[in-house]
Each structure stands twice: as C-alpha cells, then as structure tokens.
C-alpha cells in the first residue's frame, strides 16, 4: 500500500502475535510483478492494512464477535475485506482498530445505524479510555481538527500490567530498522519507505503513552 517504488507485501501483516489472524484475505493484493500470490494492485488511495474487531455487549476482549483485516484509505475510511456479521440490532457494540505501528483505538458504545449497519468516526472525538488516574493514559491524539492514533508503537505485545504502551522497546524496533529504505518495516513510523531520524521523532513525541484497552 506504500509508494510504488518497491514491491509491497501481498496480503496483510497480522498473521503473527498478538493478532494471530491466519485468514489469507487480501493475499491477492500486492505488486503483481514481484509477488506470485498477488493478482491485483492496491487501490491508489490505500495507505496500509489495519485490523478491525467488534465487541458486543461490553468492552471486554471475550465479547469479540468479529475480527477482520481492512484497508485504510487516505481519507481515513476503512474498507473491510470480510463479509458483514449478523447480530441483534438492539445491542451495543465497541469497534477496535489496530495498526502495526500505532497504539490501538476503541470506540465508545455505538449501535447499528437504523438497525442495519455499524459505523464510527474516530476523527471527531477522543476514543475509549479506561479512566485510570495515570496521567499517561491516552485514547487518541488531538492533531489539528482531528483525533488520530498515536504512532511509534512498533512493538505490539500486550503487557497485563501496563496494557499497550510506547516504551524503549519501540525505540529498539526503530533502531533495528534505521537506515533501511524501500522496505515495508515496523520501524518506519511515518511510512515513507525511508527509516530515519524522523521516525525516531514519532517515538520521542509519543513515548510513555499508555492505553488499557482490554486484551
């Protein structure tokens, strides 16, 4: 989904931990000249893959009823690669969006629109927070007129005591990738195919932030 100066991966990057999503949805996307599994190029306005989950009834991970990969576009729209789920129109839902190098975000309670569709705009207000007294706890970052995800989180492992956090391990991810160009890397935090000091700035600006979305 990145700039077309190098072959981009065919399929999504969420097969490993902590997602362990083994469905091969999206394997047909990619650079058709370089990836034998790819049969069609990414749409020109696609930025990257995200991982989307829906929780029904409450915000606990055990309430997850739907998991799927999606493509995020330059305007922020996410298109899902799975068929829609079926459920009761009167229940409440939480939508979780994860990206391989950002802190995850989860919606506040939302319901089906007209009993038929589920949507949520994360750009208009801060996302779900547990509400601890810890000052470093965050949902999203207010940037200009929009609320956005916190970048610089290259290590996605969940810690039961600290939740998802930006720390020195994320700096290590950048350190390992620093100096590489034209590659699809976790440490390329601004996703311009050039892992350099500007990516380190993402980590520096967001280091220490935590969120406690139940895993």
Indicate where each model-derived feature is located.
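Short amphipathic, basic-aromatic surface patches that mediate peripheral association
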Residues: 1-43
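Short Pro-Gly-centered beta-turn/loop motif in secreted/extracellular proteins
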Residues: 44, 78-93, 100-101
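Beta-strand signatures of extracellular beta-sandwich domains
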Residues: 49-55, 94-96
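Glycine-centered loop-to-beta-strand initiation motif
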Residues: 52, 72-83, 199
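Acidic glycine-/aspartate-rich tracts in secreted/extracellular proteins
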Residues: 56-60, 100-103, 178-180, 207-209
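Short, acidic Ser/Thr/Gly-rich low-complexity loop/linker segments typical of extracellular
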Residues: 58-77
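Short acidic/polar inter-strand loop motif in beta-rich domains
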Residues: 99-112
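Alpha-helical segments with a strong preference for the paired helices of cellulosomal dockerin domains
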Residues: 139, 146, 156-183, 192-215
């Amino acid at each position: 989904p990145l700039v077309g100066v190098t072959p981009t991966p065919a399929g999504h990057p969420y097969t490993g931990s902590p997602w362990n999503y083994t469905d091969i949805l999206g394997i047909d996307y990619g650079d058709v000249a370089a990836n034998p599994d790819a049969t069609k190029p990414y749409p020109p306005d696609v930025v990257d893959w995200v991982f989307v989950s829906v929780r029904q009834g409450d915000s606990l991970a055990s309430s997850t009823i739907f998991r799927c990969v999606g493509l995020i576009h330059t305007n922020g729209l996410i298109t899902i690669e799975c068929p829609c789920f079926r459920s009761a129109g009167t229940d409440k839902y939480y939508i979780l969006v994860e990206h391989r190098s950002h802190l995850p975000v989860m919606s506040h309670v939302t319901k089906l629109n007209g009993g038929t569709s589920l949507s949520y705009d994360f750009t208009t207000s801060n996302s779900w927070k547990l509400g601890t007294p810890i000052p470093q706890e965050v949902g999203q970052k207010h940037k200009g007129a929009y609320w956005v995800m916190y970048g610089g989180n290259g290590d996605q492992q969940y810690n039961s005591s600290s939740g998802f956090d930006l720390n020195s391990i994320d700096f290590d991810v950048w350190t390992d990738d620093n100096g590489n160009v034209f590659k699809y890397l976790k440490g390329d935090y601004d996703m311009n195919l050039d892992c350099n000091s500007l990516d380190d700035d993402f980590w520096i600006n967001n280091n220490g932030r935590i969120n406690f979305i139940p895993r």
